[in-house]
A protein has these predicted regions:
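Alpha-helical scaffolding within the catalytic cores
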Residues: 61-63, 115, 227-239, 270-279, ...
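C-terminal GPI-anchoring signal of eukaryotic secretory precursors
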Residues: 439-460, 473-480
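Glycoside hydrolase catalytic-domain groove-lining segments
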Residues: 237, 241-244, 249-298
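Substrate-binding cleft of secreted/luminal carbohydrate-active enzymes
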Residues: 28-51, 66-67, 73, 78-81, ...
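Cleavable N-terminal signal peptides of Sec/SRP-targeted secreted and luminal proteins
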Residues: 3-21, 458-473
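Aromatic-lined carbohydrate-recognition surfaces of secreted/lumenal glycan-active proteins
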Residues: 171-234, 268, 283-299
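A solvent-exposed, charged loop/short amphipathic helix patch at secondary-structure junctions
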Residues: 96-100, 144-180
Length: 485
């Protein structure tokens, strides 16, 4: 078996390299020549204004809105009561805007949505991240369970009250159809209007896609981190949403029970992998940018992530090809001077220094391997290669603005060799070649059919590769959770 596996490697390693060479291109990064960005999306403006605590985000290459709020020139987050008339139930069961999508006027919703977008996002704004955070219900009937059962029950009552003569089977069938059709219309038309009004912004819904790999509490010893097969199937059915989105926004918030564990890495790894899978299938011409919501602290606490979990979250996301991390938090991050100082301590400690490390390494790899025309992604997603600057490099404070890494000539060559061993280039739109050194005029004009051809080939080869590994060497197809610094 060992000899057979070695023989397969001789075939598969060049194949892996070829697969990456025909991947659909990525969109260029939101900041030129900065392939991986870290954004701050916590409302911490009070720390500076009321408590005179400067979080010094810019110093560590962490990008924020000018006022450190959640609705600015860099990133906008629309919550349920801030965009149109989103129908939902409060936690105590009170309906708002009809409660369910089929009980709310879509035209009325869109009219208010247009006003809300115009008021929040200036017409001259050319780019930026815009996240719609609608979490109360899911557009797929079967995903409304637990606290979301109220949407199914209310939909059944809504249909039954209008048609008391119908059988229960017909009521169930029609209620599901009405809910799913109305939910889809709400989300799809909202995105369509948003893109019509602000076409250059990166629009998407928060937690789409989800992986539903939350069973680490139930079976911690046997936890794999993989998305359940039926949830992957459900995600595939949302093609209407993916093809309309211009970015994907999933999340990797870590529960404290996962602290510094292999399960934390498994949890993050497969959530990011699923988002990257959806990003590739969403469009014909390019892969959607994926931004990962994370937190600087463990859930429901102000305990900073450990160094290991910074690697598990920020490091893993960068290595798998995400466009960036969004560090999210609520008003509890700035409700007192003590809390602000805790946030500042985290940023000026391991979080900030690791943020500089990863963003610098991603930039260095893009420059060295991809001619600044692509981002570095792992040759194989299951490897343990990370975008880290060498320990021998030094951080210097440049122009009183931010830290930058300075690498010695000897370390530079060794680092480039190490990056070539673990990473390949994922070229930006209109660029191709092993080092993204060639530009295609056809792709620039948007006329070429090459991306679709490449997509079909890459999907076929990826499926073939996965099947070979699964059938021939299943025990070896495990994520290597050792770390490389």
């Amino acid at each position: 078996m060992y000899n057979l596996w070695v023989a397969w490697l001789g075939v598969l390693l060049p194949l892996i390299k070829f697969i990456h060479s025909v991947l659909k291109p990525a969109l260029p990064p939101v900041i030129k020549n900065q392939p991986f960005n870290i954004f701050w999306a916590a409302p911490t403006m009070q720390c500076q204004h009321f408590f005179n605590v400067d979080l010094t985000l810019q110093l560590f290459n962490i990008i924020s809105n000018p006022l450190e709020n959640q609705r600015g020139s860099t990133i906008v987050i629309f919550y349920p009561n801030e965009l149109g008339y989103y129908p939902y139930f409060s936690q105590d069961g009170k309906p708002f805007n009809g409660g369910i999508p089929q009980n709310m006027s879509l035209s009325k919703h869109l009219k208010k949505t247009a006003d809300d977008i115009a008021n929040v996002i200036s017409w001259w704004r050319s780019e930026g991240l815009v996240v719609i955070d609608w979490e109360s219900w899911k557009p797929q009937w079967g995903r409304n369970w637990g606290n979301r059962l109220i949407y199914r029950n209310y939909s059944l009552a809504f249909t039954r009250n209008r048609h008391p003569e119908w059988s229960e089977m017909k009521v169930n069938t029609v209620a599901q159809q009405e809910f799913e059709n109305a939910g889809r219309s709400f989300m799809h038309t909202t995105l369509s209007l948003a893109l019509e009004m602000r076409p250059k912004c990166l629009w998407g819904f928060y937690l789409y896609p989800d992986c539903y790999n939350y069973d680490y509490k139930i079976n911690p010893q046997t936890y794999t981190g993989k998305c359940p097969k039926d949830e992957i199937f459900h995600n595939d059915q949302l093609q209407w949403l993916w093809e309309k989105s211009t970015a994907l926004y999933t999340s990797i918030y870590l529960d404290k029970i996962l602290k510094s564990s292999l399960n934390a890495l498994k949890f993050v790894h497969y959530r990011v992998r699923e988002a990257m899978r959806i990003a590739e299938m969403a469009r014909r011409d390019y892969i959607l940018p994926v931004f990962i919501f994370s937190r600087p602290f463990y859930l429901h606490s102000i305990e900073a992530l450990s160094q290991e979990d910074l690697v598990h979250t920020i490091g893993e996301s960068a290595a798998l090809g995400a466009a960036g991390i969004i560090l999210w938090g609520g008003y509890e991050y700035s409700d007192s001077k003590e809390t602000c100082l805790s946030v500042q301590k985290s940023i000026q400690g391991s979080l900030g220094h690791y943020a500089v490390n990863v963003t610098s390494a991603a930039k260095f790899c893009s420059q060295s391997l991809c001619n600044n025309n692509g981002r570095c992604i792992r040759k194989t997603p299951e490897s343990s290669s990370y975008l880290h600057m060498p320990e021998s490099s030094t951080k210097k404070y440049i122009l009183s603005k931010s830290f930058r890494f300075i690498i010695s000539p000897t370390s530079k060559l060794k680092t480039i060799r190490a990056m070539k061993d673990g990473f390949v280039c994922h070229c930006y739109y209109s660029w191709h070649g092993e080092s993204c050194q060639r530009q295609s005029s056809g792709l620039l004009r948007g006329k070429s059919e090459a991306p679709m051809t490449n997509f079909n080939l890459s999907v076929f080869l990826s499926m073939t590769f996965s099947m070979i590994l699964w059938n021939s060497a299943t025990p070896s197809f495990n994520v290597n959770f050792s770390l490389k610094y």
